[in-house]
Amino acid sequence: MKRVKKILVLCTIFCVIVGIWFYKNKSIENDNTDKFKLDATYDFDIEKLKSEGLPIIVDFGSDSCIPCKEMAPLLEDLNEEYRGKAIVKFVDISKNGDAVKDFPVKVIPTQFFFNADGTPFKPKNVQQSNLMMYSSEENEEHAFTAHEGQLDKSDFKNILNEMGVN
């Protein structure tokens, strides 16, 4: 009888430990899923993204924009391929116009690029990159690096590679 009690106690302890482990790992997985989900239309916070310590690509567009729709599968692929190495976000400005208020967006789609330290990405060869550099009106410091229009996968990969992502 004592042996049966010992076995029951050990089984109970084991089940509790396994349950705690599953609970903790599930919440970590949910945090990572939220952090790396592509659509940031309603929860876009660039400062929070910058604090993650990963390079960032933000694409401002709209579900009703044809070039944006054409880029959607590419952004999904990039988001999946670079998960944990870079953050790729899409913000639908027709659903959340406030998300774009601090960015110089003139047309959609427009992409913005940030280094892992949160600073605007600066390509080695600005003239050949087809990227636009924006400076702050207050102090003339480099504030944004952007691209207007569509980019293809090789363009994104080249930029990410130059940002130090393999």
Regions found by a protein language model. Give the residues of each.
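Non-catalytic, surface beta->alpha helical segment in thiol-disulfide oxidoreductase systems
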Residues: 113-166
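Solvent-exposed loop/turn segments at secondary-structure junctions
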Residues: 62-66, 93-98, 118-120, 150-153
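A short beta-strand-turn-helix
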Residues: 35-54
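Thiol-based oxidoreductase modules, predominantly thioredoxin-like and allied folds used
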Residues: 60, 79, 83-98, 105-108
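Short active-site neighborhood of thiol/selenol oxidoreductases, capturing the structured segment around
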Residues: 51-63
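N-terminal targeting signals for export/organelle localization
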Residues: 1-36
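Typically the conserved alpha-helix immediately C-terminal to a functionally engaged Cys/Sec
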Residues: 68-82
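C-type cytochrome heme c attachment motif
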Residues: 63-70, 110
